[in-house]
A protein has these predicted regions:
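Anionic-ligand binding patches
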Residues: 23-28, 34-220
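Alpha-helical and His/Cys-centered functional microenvironments
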Residues: 7
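Cationic, low-complexity basic patches in intrinsically disordered or flexible, solvent-exposed regions
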Residues: 13-16
Length: 220
C-alpha cells in the first residue's frame, strides 16, 4: 500500500484550493454510515462524484476484523472492490484518549458494546475519565483508496480534548464531547461548517482530492 505523505500533498495542493480542469471522477465510499457519507460528500469537491454502496448494489455488511484503523480501512475497501469492481475507498476512524492509553481507538464505534450506540459510547468514555485531569485526545481517520488496481492510504488527524459533559445537538458519534484544540466548544456546538473545515475526516478528504490533482488523474 502506498501511503501518501500529507506534507508532500499539501505542498502542491495549496497552490490551488480547487481541482480545476479535472473530469468527473466516480468513486464509491465503502461505508454503511450515512452520517459519514453525507459529511464526506459535503467536503469533497464537486469534481469527485461519490457513490454510495447502494448505488453499486453492494448491500452486505462490511468486514471489520482488524486491530488497526489502517487494517480495517484496507479490509473494507478490498471487500467492496472485489464485490463490485468499482474504484472505491473506505475509512476507519478512532478516538484516542491519552489518559486511557489510546482507548477507545479501533473500538471507537462499539466502545460500549456491539450495538454501536453513540450515547452509550460517550457515557462510558466520560465515566472512564472521571477523576482524570488529563483529557487530551485526538481523532484519527485513515482512508484506503483502491484506484485502477492500486492501493493508497491517507490519514487525517486533529488534536483536542474531551469535554466534562456532552454539549451540542449537531454532528454525530462523539461530536458532543470532543473539543478541537484552539476552541472552547465541542464539534456538536460548532456546527458542520466549522467541523468540515477542521476535522480529521476533512483533512483526509483534502488529501484524497489533492492526490487526484497531483497524480494527474482525470485531467482534461
Amino acid at each position: 500500500m502506498r501511503h501518501e505523505k500529507a506534507s508532500d500533498i499539501w505542498a502542491e495542493s495549496e497552490k490551488s484550493a480547487a481541482i480545476s480542469g479535472m473530469k468527473k471522477i466516480r468513486l464509491c465510499f465503502a461505508t454503511n454510515n450515512l452520517h459519514k457519507l453525507e459529511e464526506v460528500r459535503a467536503i469533497l469537491p464537486e469534481e469527485i462524484e461519490l457513490l454510495s454502496l447502494q448505488e453499486t448494489d453492494c448491500r452486505e455488511e462490511l468486514p471489520e476484523n482488524q486491530r488497526s484503523l489502517e487494517g480495517n480501512a484496507l479490509e473494507k475497501a478490498t471487500f467492496v472492490y472485489q464485490k463490485t469492481a468499482t474504484d472505491c475507498f473506505a475509512d476507519d476512524t478512532g478516538l484516542e484518549v491519552e489518559a486511557l492509553d489510546g482507548e477507545p481507538g479501533v473500538d471507537t464505534a462499539h466502545y460500549a458494546g456491539p450495538e454501536r450506540d453513540a450515547q452509550k459510547n460517550m457515557a462510558l468514555l466520560l465515566k472512564n475519565l472521571e477523576g482524570k485531569p488529563n483529557r487530551n485526545a485526538c481523532f484519527r481517520t485513515v482512508f484506503c483508496l483502491i484506484w485502477q488496481g492500486e492501493t493508497y492510504s491517507f490519514e487525517g488527524r486533529i488534536e483536542g480534548e474531551i469535554a466534562a459533559e456532552a454539549k451540542g445537538s449537531g454532528g454525530f458519534g462523539y461530536d458532543p464531547v470532543f473539543i478541537p484544540r484552539g476552541y472552547s466548544q465541542t464539534f456538536a456546538e460548532l456546527g458542520p461548517e466549522v467541523k468540515n473545515r477542521l476535522s480529521h475526516r476533512a483533512e483526509a478528504c483534502r488529501q484524497l482530492a489533492a492526490f487526484f490533482k497531483t497524480a494527474g488523474i482525470g485531467k482534461m
